[in-house]
Curated annotation (Swiss-Prot):
Name of this chain's protein: Adult-specific rigid cuticular protein 15.7
Cleaved signal peptide residues: none
Pfam families assigned to the protein according to its UniProt record, in alphabetical order: Chitin_bind_4 (PF00379)
Domain Chitin-binding type R&R: 23-89
InterPro entries in alphabetical order: CHIT_BIND_RR_consensus, Cuticle_Struct_Prot, Insect_cuticle
Keyword set includes Ion transport: no
GO cellular component: chitin-based extracellular matrix
MF terms in GO: structural constituent of chitin-based larval cuticle
Function: Component of the rigid cuticle of the spider.
Keyword tags: Cuticle
Length: 159
């Protein structure tokens, strides 16, 4: 198998670097490539004020590639993305072909709902008098246990 032989011989490579000063300014980067041609990398620079600028890239063995350049500062996070991934063209974002061994989802069947039946109100023979609400009052003592805790004290007090 030539593919297997290639992956055994070419295992890939990686590089990385980083630096930071006493003021909080920093920089780092790395790059990784495998023996089949896939790569990914990242680089970022930051300062003591919390501003960041960087990018990352990824390239797959089938040719798909993405690069993201970003800035994060007092104005927020902003990213610029460049890619050739399927379904991401501005002219036809939903045009990506989906290849799957599974059947597409089936829309649920909504049950038919009949209109509600409203019964006619009974006819009133005459006006009914209702008694005025009674006025009453009540009072009660309700006790709740509450734990009291202080250094050297641990008991329950009931009010």
């Amino acid at each position: 198998n030539p593919l297997l032989a290639t992956s055994i011989i070419n295992t890939g490579s990686s590089i990385s670097a980083r630096s930071q000063d006493g003021l909080g300014n920093y920089a780092f980067n790395y790059g990784i490539g495998n023996g089949l041609g896939a790569t990914n990398s990242r680089a970022e620079f930051g300062d003591a004020a919390g501003n960041k600028k960087g990018s990352y890239t990824i390239t797959d063995i089938d040719g798909r590639a993405r690069r993201v350049d970003y800035v994060a500062d007092a104005a927020g996070f902003r990213a610029s993305i460049k890619t050739n991934e399927p379904g991401t063209a501005l002219s036809a974002p939903a045009a990506a072909a989906i290849v799957s061994p599974y059947a597409p989802p089936v829309a649920p069947v909504a049950p038919a709902v009949a209109a509600p039946v409203v019964a006619a109100a009974p006819a009133l023979a005459g006006a009914h008098l209702l008694a005025a609400p009674g006025i009453s009052s009540y009072s009660s003592v309700i006790g709740h246990g509450a734990g009291l805790y202080a250094p050297g004290i641990a008991k329950t007090i009931f009010w």
